[in-house]
């Protein structure tokens, strides 16, 4: 049978502790990366909504205004 020594047991425990610490550090890094990716995704959505609200909506409203009110008024003024 294999005889365990205090040194081999101590080395085994140290290796287990080191690997547990490395796994915990990796889990924390992964959590931070997921949070960062989530914030980036949320920020992208916010920017897209802002572009629609600031640029596209006013232009479409202006086009509708021109089509529904200005154009008929100009045609009526010509006639």
UniProtKB/Swiss-Prot annotation:
GO biological process: defense response to bacterium
Stretches of the chain forming a coiled coil according to its record: 15-35
Purpose of the protein: Inhibits host cell division leading to filamentation. Does not prevent host cell growth, DNA synthesis or chromosome segregation. Does not seem to be essential for productive bacterial host infection.
Reported consequences of knocking out the gene: Disrupts inhibition of host cell division. Has no effect on host DNA synthesis, burst size or latent period during infection.
Residues passing through the membrane, by range: 37-57
Chain's gene name: 56
An annotated GO cellular component: host cell membrane
Lipid bilayer topology: Single-pass membrane protein
Alphabetical keyword list: Antibiotic, Antimicrobial, Coiled coil, Host membrane, Membrane, Transmembrane, Transmembrane helix
Cell compartments where the protein resides: Host membrane
The protein, known as: Inhibitor of host cell division protein
Keyword Chloroplast: no
């Amino acid at each position: 049978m294999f005889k365990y020594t205090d040194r081999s047991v101590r080395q085994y425990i140290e290796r287990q502790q080191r690997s547990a610490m490395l796994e915990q550090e990796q889990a924390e890094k992964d959590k931070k990366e997921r949070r960062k990716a989530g914030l980036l995704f949320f920020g992208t959505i916010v920017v897209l909504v802002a572009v629609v609200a600031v640029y596209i909506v006013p232009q479409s409203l202006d086009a509708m205004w021109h089509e529904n009110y200005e154009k008929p008024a100009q045609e009526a003024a010509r006639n």
